[in-house]
């Protein structure tokens, strides 16, 4: 069974693609459209465009895009039915997936999806064990003494893994899951001598780890009895890879986009407490350095990142190393320096939520200011270090994209070197990126002053160097897209096999399917009828193609005649052959081609 088209239309009409895409991509208005870094492939120059008017999106680079359903399918790697259900939930329109899929050949879930399902099922069991069983009472008390309310425990899905070697094993086995797959998912361990399986997590408080889409892909089990290690995380699996996961990104994404800033903490416990205190744009890595994949995710949401690591030597070293790397990646980097020996959880516990949020708001420095304040003693007493760090800081400031923030950093840093802001600014000139540094490519770029160059309209590169026949096919399709009556009048006038451009041929077929179910053409609806990025790009290209609104007298008939010339030798090609015969001096061929041209001209009269 198919989902009722009226339900699909209602969900699409209630879902604004700009709002949807903005949850995943930082967008900037460029002319009539919005542009940002593509969420589907890694890039440094924005090539992902959203049209609010047409309710479609498209990437110049990887060619992915479409309407709200296709974007959701791609970004979450789910089926069309699942995308409709997800967006339906978003706009409070009910979609019964079970009824939709009944009596149909539903594909068996992939291994990755089954792994996620296992994690989400056992989470419910862990939560029950924590909140409803005698065995979980000690763990629950431990959490409550550390400020975890019942509401927070439920919100975060925190649970308890009993001290049993087969609690999770038996549960998943009863549910019909493959035990070896549960091992590959990281929920079970294996005895390599007899290949028996047992629970990986035992007698631990269980914190679910979610991916960017909010699906549970792993766990961190915390001891509450002093056993080692303090935290036991899921191993690397097909669905849980530390270099790709930022804890709390699924919850923080909207706030990151709204505030245009992401705050990076050291651990997920700090994130939970900071979020509860009111700091909603916080994330953390899972005990690893910030990876290139992490930076790619961050850059698509914001260009401003604030580091708030623990107030100890290790935290300071990590801040310097991470901040330097982020600055090199073109991000605006800020630092919040916690009091010595404190982490966010301890600060909140000592001073309270309000004091913490006020501190975060008022004690934020540029990375350059933080760095020079850490190095100030060495700068003051070591002349060799003075010169070295002056060059380093000059280079750091030169990497800052905002001239306003750059000037602020100059004013903050100059006193540490006993130089005027003007002298420091002069030093920075030697480290400034050249004017032509800014990248430019086929997707748009920057001029010599760093000003943005508008890319071509979506898909227009497809229309370069078209033949005469292809130009006729393009114009013909454009008129058919504008009016259903025009389509019905001319559909049988053209044999689809006469199209020389295969993409245009497929569009012709798509229009037939589309108008069979719709009375008025709409690009946002039409893209649902295609299943390839190339064809989707062709549809979008045609949508952007400028042509007179009303056809001139006999204009469409002329296009039909040109299209139907395929299979027949055209006068244009005969003239070409005549010229070649003349060049080589073949009189017989010249006579033959002249006769053919005369005959063709008579047919057209």
UniProtKB/Swiss-Prot annotation:
Q: Which cofactor does it need?
A: Zn(2+); Mg(2+)
A family per Pfam: DnaG_cat_HB
Source organism, top-level taxon: Bacteria
The segments annotated as CHC2-type zinc fingers are 38-62
Q: How is the cofactor bound?
A: Binds 1 zinc ion per monomer.
Q: Which residues bind Mg(2+) 2?
A: 310, 312
One GO-annotated biological process of the protein:
DNA replication, synthesis of primer
Molecular function terms from GO? ATP binding; DNA binding; DNA helicase activity; DNA-directed RNA polymerase activity; zinc ion binding
Which InterPro entries does the protein's record reference? Answer: DNA_heli_DnaB-like_N_sf (IPR036185), DNA_helicase_N/primase_C (IPR016136), DNA_primase_core_N_sf (IPR037068), DNA_primase_DnaG (IPR006295), DNA_primase_Znf_CHC2 (IPR036977), DnaG_bac (IPR030846), DnaG_cat_HB (IPR048453), DNAG_N (IPR013264)
**Which keywords describe this protein according to UniProt?**
DNA replication, DNA-binding, DNA-directed RNA polymerase, Magnesium, Metal-binding, Nucleotidyltransferase, Primosome, Transcription, Transferase, Zinc, Zinc-finger
What PROSITE patterns does UniProt report for this protein, alphabetically?
TOPRIM
* Swiss-Prot/TrEMBL catalytic activity: ssDNA + n NTP = ssDNA/pppN(pN)n-1 hybrid + (n-1) diphosphate
Q: Where does Mg(2+) 1 bind?
A: 266, 310
The Toprim domain extends over: 260-341
Q: How does it assemble?
A: Monomer. Interacts with DnaB.
**Family under the similarity heading:** Belongs to the DnaG primase family.
Q: PANTHER family from the entry? A: DNA PRIMASE
| Protein name per Swiss-Prot or TrEMBL | DNA primase
- Can you name the source organism? Staphylococcus aureus (strain Mu50 / ATCC 700699)
